[in-house]
């Protein structure tokens, strides 16, 4: 009987007509526009049409069993169909994994375009229709029976296919629903198989109607997602670039979020059934919550965001949280992240939107323990004396001495600039004068905060950075030695802001012990860098004398301080012309 029927599958590109219209005009589905591709994650509604060959209603040419109207009507009303989907047409692709960039997140030139890393999709699904109980189910409809054909409205979801699947194989199984025999209901198949031979038990089912129809359709992947992470003034920022690279149709971005991936915090289940947490990885009791990443508003960040073919859009996120870690927090906390993009196209007749989850690079929260901040009033007028307040928050260790040294001439050190760029930078450096370039703040205990005011004067208009050239010198060890041979009085003709005098004073102050200085100048790639608070190890003077003053607790002697524990925050001032 199966060979006496024709089977056709229709995938309409528009919503299906109401059931009453299909029943009144069964051939209406032929006029509907068809789809030649599907989207991974969507829920697809389609029609399976089973048509009897040779005209069942005429009673001729139908063959045994289907040659009469009554036989066809009896079979058509007893048929049922079920659809399933599987991956077909080759192995799944990489899902964007091949776009991964070897450049670590946060490093390099902020203006570079090659720092975006490809993010591979993990899961793609659609919301589907929700029942009153909140569960997502697929609708099941009875077939529409006409004179010579049966129409099965079917629904299948493409959210269980692996990411990167190129084609979907949709299989529909059609069978005749039989009334279960009374002996089977009373005794069950197990008891019947124990008392009868299997051939006798299933002989009646061998003649039942069974057919299977399948087709292959192209699957379009979700939008491409690329990520770039960097840190500015201690704030963790993430830029997500969404690109419509695979569809010629317009897609709309309805929402995009960044969430911590708590599932990545757990090790595989142990043999005894216990689960362990990974060290230094954020988990549900950690510091980063589901709402820690906030999308920053932009000029074109309203939803929905349309993307035509090969168009892209950037979204900026900031990790909100305290700069100082709470008590008992782990140092160097690693936060695995995922991005969730809600998108849709006009060619989704049944699915309102699709949700795609992407794997993002992890964020490492290396919170500095020694932070220098600066603040001043802005704007100021030219030739007006203004004060910059520097605050040092020390949660690292005890220091014997802390000094601030204004060193604008070091800004060009190690940089290869053309003559025009050199003149422009020199003009900018000469625009701000520091009245007190050498500042000794004394000792600093762990857990304390030092505040110091430095006077400046601007000679030209413009926007100037006042924390970049303020070098921070920290003395952290002491040792007995001979006094420095060059500790002689300064000449009256020497300016206190000249490099020669500052170098002499620094060597004289080096007699207090071993020190280390930090600035915002760009270090070489061999140095350890912390994105957003880039620092450079300038000099380490050997211990030459013992300090005089209040005794402090000092940790064991170290060659250098860890650069990721010290940070400087920028401070800019706007200089304008005086009001006449």
From Swiss-Prot:
GO-annotated biological processes: cilium assembly; regulation of cell population proliferation
List of residues that carry Phosphothreonine: 541
Molecular function GO terms recorded: alpha-tubulin binding
Composition bias type Low complexity, residue spans: 124-137, 492-502
Compositional bias of kind Gly residues: 105-116
Keyword Cytoplasm listed: yes
Compartment(s): Cytoplasm, Cytoskeleton, Spindle; Vesicle; Midbody; Cytoplasm
CC per GO annotation: centriolar satellite; intracellular membrane-bounded organelle; midbody; mitotic spindle; plasma membrane; TRAPPII protein complex
InterPro entries, sorted: TRAPP14_C, TRAPP14_N, TRAPPC14
Major localisation: cytoplasm
Tissue-wise expression: Broadly expressed. High levels in brain, cerebellum, testis and whole blood.
Record keywords, A-Z: Cilium biogenesis/degradation, Cytoplasm, Cytoskeleton, Disease variant, Phosphoprotein, Primary microcephaly
Polar residues composition bias: residue spans: 512-525
Annotated region (Disordered), positions in chain: 90-138, 480-533
Post-translational modification Phosphoserine, affected residues: 491, 517, 546
Described function: Specific subunit of the TRAPP (transport protein particle) II complex, a highly conserved vesicle tethering complex that functions in late Golgi trafficking as a membrane tether. TRAPP II complex also has GEF activity toward RAB1A. TRAPPC14 is dispensable for TRAPPII complex integrity but mediates RAB3IP preciliary vesicle trafficking to the mother centriole during ciliogenesis. Modulates YAP1 activity as transcriptional regulator.
Subunit record text: Component of the multisubunit TRAPP II complex, which includes at least TRAPPC1, TRAPPC2, TRAPPC2L, TRAPPC3, TRAPPC4, TRAPPC5, TRAPPC6A/B, TRAPPC9, TRAPPC10 and TRAPPC14. TRAPPC9, TRAPPC10 and TRAPPC14 are specific subunits of the TRAPP II complex. Interacts with alpha-tubulin during mitosis. Interacts with RAB3IP (via the N-terminal region); this interaction mediates RAB3IP association with the TRAPP II complex. Interacts with TRAPPC10. Interacts with FBF1.
Disease link: Microcephaly 25, primary, autosomal recessive: A form of microcephaly, a disease defined as a head circumference more than 3 standard deviations below the age, sex and ethnically matched mean. Brain weight is markedly reduced and the cerebral cortex is disproportionately small. MCPH25 patients additionally manifest global developmental delay, severe intellectual disability with speech impairment, attention deficit-hyperactivity disorder, and reduced white matter and thin corpus callosum on brain imaging.
UniProt name for this protein: Trafficking protein particle complex subunit 14
Organism for this UniProt entry: Homo sapiens (Human)
